[in-house]
Design a protein with these regions (language model features):
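PP2C/PPM-type serine/threonine phosphatase catalytic domain
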Residues: 1-182
Protein backbone atom coordinates (compact mmCIF):
# COMPACT_ATOMS: atom_id res chain seq x y z
CA UNK A 1 0.00 0.00 0.00
CA UNK A 2 0.85 3.67 -0.13
CA UNK A 3 3.48 4.70 2.40
CA UNK A 4 4.45 1.13 3.25
CA UNK A 5 7.53 0.87 1.05
CA UNK A 6 10.51 -0.33 3.05
CA UNK A 7 8.36 -1.31 6.03
CA UNK A 8 8.83 -4.66 7.67
CA UNK A 9 8.62 -6.54 10.92
CA UNK A 10 10.85 -8.66 13.07
CA UNK A 11 10.36 -12.33 13.85
CA UNK A 12 12.04 -14.82 16.13
CA UNK A 13 10.74 -18.39 15.98
CA UNK A 14 11.76 -21.45 17.97
CA UNK A 15 11.38 -25.16 17.33
CA UNK A 16 12.18 -27.71 20.01
CA UNK A 17 12.54 -31.36 19.13
CA UNK A 18 13.87 -33.54 21.89
CA UNK A 19 17.01 -31.84 23.16
CA UNK A 20 17.58 -29.79 20.00
CA UNK A 21 16.45 -26.16 19.90
CA UNK A 22 16.49 -24.33 16.57
CA UNK A 23 15.92 -20.58 16.39
CA UNK A 24 15.15 -18.61 13.21
CA UNK A 25 15.51 -14.85 13.58
CA UNK A 26 15.15 -11.69 11.49
CA UNK A 27 15.35 -8.23 13.06
CA UNK A 28 15.92 -7.26 16.67
CA UNK A 29 13.53 -9.55 18.53
CA UNK A 30 15.68 -11.87 20.61
CA UNK A 31 15.87 -15.39 21.96
CA UNK A 32 17.55 -16.12 25.28
CA UNK A 33 18.17 -19.37 27.13
CA UNK A 34 18.38 -19.64 30.90
CA UNK A 35 20.67 -22.66 31.34
CA UNK A 36 21.82 -23.76 34.79
CA UNK A 37 20.76 -20.38 36.17
CA UNK A 38 22.78 -18.32 33.66
CA UNK A 39 21.22 -16.27 30.87
CA UNK A 40 22.66 -16.49 27.37
CA UNK A 41 21.52 -14.48 24.37
CA UNK A 42 21.08 -16.95 21.51
CA UNK A 43 20.51 -14.45 18.70
CA UNK A 44 22.30 -11.39 17.33
CA UNK A 45 20.22 -8.30 16.58
CA UNK A 46 20.00 -7.18 12.96
CA UNK A 47 20.36 -3.54 13.92
CA UNK A 48 22.59 -0.56 13.37
CA UNK A 49 23.43 -0.53 17.09
CA UNK A 50 24.54 -4.19 17.08
CA UNK A 51 26.76 -3.48 14.07
CA UNK A 52 28.27 -0.43 15.79
CA UNK A 53 28.85 -2.32 19.05
CA UNK A 54 30.49 -5.18 17.16
CA UNK A 55 32.73 -2.67 15.32
CA UNK A 56 33.76 -1.11 18.65
CA UNK A 57 32.13 2.23 17.82
CA UNK A 58 29.68 2.13 20.76
CA UNK A 59 29.26 0.40 24.09
CA UNK A 60 25.98 -1.41 24.81
CA UNK A 61 25.18 1.31 27.37
CA UNK A 62 25.70 4.07 24.78
CA UNK A 63 23.51 2.20 22.29
CA UNK A 64 20.52 2.26 24.68
CA UNK A 65 20.19 6.04 24.34
CA UNK A 66 21.52 6.51 20.80
CA UNK A 67 19.12 8.42 18.49
CA UNK A 68 19.31 5.60 15.89
CA UNK A 69 18.67 2.77 18.37
CA UNK A 70 15.51 1.67 16.51
CA UNK A 71 17.16 1.25 13.10
CA UNK A 72 17.09 -2.39 12.03
CA UNK A 73 19.19 -3.72 9.16
CA UNK A 74 17.09 -6.75 8.27
CA UNK A 75 13.32 -7.27 8.50
CA UNK A 76 10.55 -9.43 7.06
CA UNK A 77 8.65 -7.61 4.33
CA UNK A 78 11.28 -5.01 3.51
CA UNK A 79 13.05 -7.25 0.96
CA UNK A 80 11.49 -10.33 -0.66
CA UNK A 81 14.85 -12.13 -0.44
CA UNK A 82 15.37 -11.67 3.30
CA UNK A 83 16.76 -14.79 4.94
CA UNK A 84 16.64 -15.50 8.67
CA UNK A 85 19.70 -16.37 10.71
CA UNK A 86 19.48 -19.89 12.12
CA UNK A 87 20.86 -20.86 15.50
CA UNK A 88 20.98 -24.33 17.00
CA UNK A 89 21.74 -25.45 20.53
CA UNK A 90 21.03 -28.35 22.85
CA UNK A 91 18.78 -27.83 25.85
CA UNK A 92 18.15 -29.75 29.05
CA UNK A 93 15.19 -30.30 31.32
CA UNK A 94 14.98 -27.25 33.56
CA UNK A 95 16.19 -24.78 30.93
CA UNK A 96 13.97 -21.81 30.18
CA UNK A 97 13.50 -20.16 26.77
CA UNK A 98 12.65 -16.48 26.42
CA UNK A 99 11.61 -14.89 23.13
CA UNK A 100 11.06 -11.15 23.31
CA UNK A 101 10.68 -7.98 21.31
CA UNK A 102 13.07 -5.07 21.70
CA UNK A 103 10.43 -3.50 23.92
CA UNK A 104 11.83 -5.77 26.65
CA UNK A 105 15.52 -6.08 25.76
CA UNK A 106 15.80 -2.36 25.04
CA UNK A 107 14.32 -1.34 28.40
CA UNK A 108 15.82 -3.64 31.03
CA UNK A 109 19.28 -5.11 31.32
CA UNK A 110 20.07 -8.79 30.90
CA UNK A 111 20.89 -9.25 34.61
CA UNK A 112 17.37 -8.09 35.54
CA UNK A 113 15.87 -10.41 32.90
CA UNK A 114 17.96 -13.29 34.28
CA UNK A 115 16.88 -12.56 37.85
CA UNK A 116 13.19 -12.52 36.92
CA UNK A 117 13.48 -15.73 34.87
CA UNK A 118 15.07 -17.46 37.89
CA UNK A 119 12.71 -15.98 40.50
CA UNK A 120 9.23 -16.35 38.91
CA UNK A 121 8.53 -20.05 38.39
CA UNK A 122 5.31 -20.00 36.37
CA UNK A 123 6.12 -19.18 32.70
CA UNK A 124 2.98 -17.05 32.14
CA UNK A 125 3.48 -15.09 35.34
CA UNK A 126 7.15 -14.67 34.49
CA UNK A 127 6.28 -13.26 31.05
CA UNK A 128 3.78 -10.85 32.62
CA UNK A 129 6.33 -9.77 35.22
CA UNK A 130 8.93 -9.04 32.53
CA UNK A 131 6.39 -6.95 30.58
CA UNK A 132 5.56 -5.01 33.76
CA UNK A 133 9.26 -4.39 34.46
CA UNK A 134 9.83 -3.05 30.94
CA UNK A 135 6.84 -0.72 31.24
CA UNK A 136 7.99 0.45 34.69
CA UNK A 137 11.40 1.23 33.18
CA UNK A 138 9.68 3.67 30.82
CA UNK A 139 8.74 1.26 28.04
CA UNK A 140 8.15 3.32 24.91
CA UNK A 141 7.74 0.40 22.48
CA UNK A 142 5.50 -2.63 22.33
CA UNK A 143 6.64 -5.30 24.79
CA UNK A 144 6.09 -8.88 23.67
CA UNK A 145 7.40 -11.76 25.78
CA UNK A 146 7.13 -15.55 25.57
CA UNK A 147 8.59 -17.75 28.32
CA UNK A 148 8.68 -21.53 27.87
CA UNK A 149 10.17 -24.16 30.15
CA UNK A 150 12.03 -27.17 28.77
CA UNK A 151 10.52 -30.32 30.22
CA UNK A 152 11.54 -33.97 30.01
CA UNK A 153 11.83 -35.58 26.58
CA UNK A 154 9.00 -38.08 27.18
CA UNK A 155 6.66 -35.26 28.14
CA UNK A 156 7.75 -33.28 25.09
CA UNK A 157 6.90 -36.24 22.83
CA UNK A 158 3.43 -36.63 24.38
CA UNK A 159 2.67 -32.95 24.07
CA UNK A 160 4.44 -32.40 20.76
CA UNK A 161 1.37 -31.52 18.71
CA UNK A 162 -0.20 -29.36 21.42
CA UNK A 163 3.08 -27.47 21.94
CA UNK A 164 3.54 -26.91 18.19
CA UNK A 165 0.04 -25.48 17.99
CA UNK A 166 0.59 -23.23 21.02
CA UNK A 167 4.00 -22.12 19.73
CA UNK A 168 2.55 -21.35 16.30
CA UNK A 169 -0.20 -19.25 17.87
CA UNK A 170 2.34 -17.48 20.10
CA UNK A 171 4.62 -16.71 17.17
CA UNK A 172 1.73 -15.34 15.13
CA UNK A 173 0.85 -13.10 18.09
CA UNK A 174 4.47 -11.86 18.29
CA UNK A 175 4.41 -11.11 14.57
CA UNK A 176 1.08 -9.28 14.85
CA UNK A 177 2.28 -7.30 17.86
CA UNK A 178 5.39 -6.27 15.97
CA UNK A 179 3.31 -5.22 12.96
CA UNK A 180 0.88 -3.22 15.07
CA UNK A 181 3.62 -1.68 17.23
CA UNK A 182 6.05 -0.98 14.38
Amino acid sequence: GVGREGMGTTCTAAMLEGERLVIAQVGDSRAYLLHQGKLQQLTRDHSLMADMIEAGQLTPEEARSHPNRSVITRALGSDPHTQPDLYETNVETGDRLLICSDGLSGMIFDDQIENTLRRVQDPQRCASQLVNEAIAAGGHDNVTVIVADVTGYAEVRRKKMARKTKLTVALVLVLLAALVGG
